[in-house]
Amino acid sequence: MKRHGTVTTITWFIIVFIMWNITAYFLFGRGAEPNDRVAKSSRELSERLNRLQVRLKDQMVINEQLLKEIDQEKHKILSKMNLEQHHDDNHVHGRPRDVAVAGVPTIAPEPREPSHTKEPEKQYPFSTYTIPIVLIACNRPSAVTRSLNSLLDTRPSAQQFPIYVSQDCGDRKTADAIREFGSKVVHMQQPDLSPIKLPTNQKKFEGYYKISRHYKWALDQMFLKHSFDAVIIVEDDLDVAVDFFEYFLATYPLLKQDPTLWCVSAWNDNGRDTRIEKNPGLLYRSDFFPGLGWMLLRKEWVQLSPKWPAGFWDDWMRHPDQRKERACIRPEVSRTDTFGKFGVSKGQFFEQHLKFISLNKEFYPFTSKDLSYLLKENYDPAFRERVYGVESRSLEDIKGGHASHLSEVRVTYRDKNNFKLITKTLGIMQDFKAGVPRTGYLGIVTCVYNGQRVYIAPESNWSGYHTDWS
């Protein structure tokens, strides 16, 4: 009994020691903020509390893991002691009874779990990450004001998510609008405002070339001058969801961990309200580069910057030479929404499609979830099994509701024209970029039609994209 009491005393001493250190850290270690800062504004106080909450959550995770390890060690010691006691008591066999040490009930170790059981999810130090946002602006003062207000209203921490505004075009009213935000943002101005020399028949595309020039300068500043490890890129015509920052914070470790990922996007190209599942936590891998609020790592930019295109940068990003068979993470419910009807595209794409995309309204705690299912080694087998495990039905059956008793269904396409017919009928995007359909992964596009999950898939022996499909 004395040995049992010693184990318990040590265990409780360790637990009390840990809890005292946590309490001392938060009560005394951080020091008081100067009074003038505390009184500065309610926003700064809110940001500080948010940072404290994130750090506390991380510390609790660490403490919980320590307690688990202590408990495991305790069980090992008790198990060994029980075996020794049984050996002394004429080698009594069988499962040891529950025993009590110093009045604390203990439970004999549970049987060992099968080796194939999933390991506990990896814990990430989210509060230590710094992920800046760069907002690309030009000459729309009201738009940049709206976008910055949206970012600032949802940002949990100024230190963790600093906001940079990169302005092109030299527009004074836009510059004044940015300066209104004072120290809440960092204002950068693209210095090269010279006209771009293009053939006469290409002059109408000059705006696209200026945008590409601006992107390169802005990302060079963020990655090469400031040496940030990751950057979230947005434009000046985006509203962001309440969990925009939470989403990128949670997916950043995956982007670092999985070499088959090269971006995280906040956008679902097929994210119309009637074509999505109302599940804010649902995420996918996608071979299609979506843009419209996306995160990139410095190691990728170092490769892209020297060969950055003079124009049409987004389509260039979608080319196999850049994508290199890597994927992006994208949500079922978009975390950005564009209100920019007028821009270089003259509003055509906005009226036909963009204005119908649904923005997520419900905060989802991604950082408290296990997102390891998005790693390629986990995702691909499960995704293929799910898609090719559901019943295959004709487009006519789906359209006519003859398969409505099925919660999920697959419709097979055999060529480009067949794919376009199916997607047009289901009311989703029909085009390809370098052979990849919007939101496609492993040749598969998914949406919701009349409340039913539909997978638009090639034959199961699919071998890759046809880069000439457009």
Can you annotate each of these PLM segments?
Residues C169-D229:
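Active-site-proximal specificity loops/subdomain of glycosyltransferases
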Residues G5-F26, P309-S470:
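C-terminal catalytic/acceptor-binding lobe
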Residues N149-F161:
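Short, acidic, metal-binding catalytic loop of nucleotide-sugar glycosyltransferases
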Residues S227-D239:
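Short beta-strand-to-loop acidic/aromatic patch adjacent to the donor-nucleotide binding site
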Residues M1-Q85, A102:
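N-terminal signal-anchor transmembrane helix specifying type II single-pass membrane topology
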Residues T130-P132, P162:
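Cell-envelope/extracellular polymer assembly enzymes that use nucleotide-activated donors
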Residues P132-R140:
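A conserved hydrophobic helix/loop-capping motif in glycosyltransferases and polysaccharide synthases
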Residues A241-D315:
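Conserved catalytic core of nucleotide-sugar-dependent glycosyltransferases
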